[in-house]
Amino acid sequence: DIVITQDELSNPVTSGESVSISCRSSKSLLYKDGKTYLNWFLQRPGQSPQLLISLMSTRASGVSDRFSGSGSRTDFTLEISRVKAEDVGVYYCQQLVEYPLTFGAGTKLELK
């Protein structure tokens, strides 16, 4: 199985700051069609996970442009600019390049 690793944030974030959340895969997620099969989700407290970004960098419908995804093959970053209270929750990355589809353990974002 592909192992997805996410790091914890070292400190709570101040509202208005930017933050980067990292994700690493044990195998390249660049498929033969040229697309990178990595999703980002946000699970807000008490809610179901919401898809933020698919194919590494494509924002889902209705998702703020404060969220951006980037990366290459095995190393990925979710950048959140001008953090707001509504961004608090657990961020998960997911690989879709092979079954079983696997998630990282999540990165919790908290505000100061």
Swiss-Prot record:
It holds the Pfam family V-set. InterPro entries: Ig-like_dom (IPR007110), Ig-like_dom_sf (IPR036179), Ig-like_fold (IPR013783), Ig_sub (IPR003599), Ig_V-set (IPR013106), IgV_Light_Chain (IPR050150). Keywords: Adaptive immunity, Disulfide bond, Immunity, Immunoglobulin. Residues 1-23 are annotated as: Framework-1. Disulfide bonds join 23-93. Residues 24-39 are annotated as: Complementarity-determining-1. Residues 103-112 are annotated as: Framework-4. One of its GO terms (biological process) is adaptive immune response. Residues 94-102 are annotated as: Complementarity-determining-3. Gene3D superfamilies: Immunoglobulins. Residues 62-93 are annotated as: Framework-3. Residues 40-54 are annotated as: Framework-2. GO terms for cellular component: immunoglobulin complex. Residues 55-61 are annotated as: Complementarity-determining-2. This chain was isolated from a myeloma protein that binds phosphorylcholine. The sequence of the V region of the heavy chain has also been determined. PANTHER family: IMMUNOGLOBULIN LIGHT CHAIN. This is Ig kappa chain V-II region MOPC 167. The lineage of its organism: Eukaryota, Metazoa, Chordata, Craniata, Vertebrata.
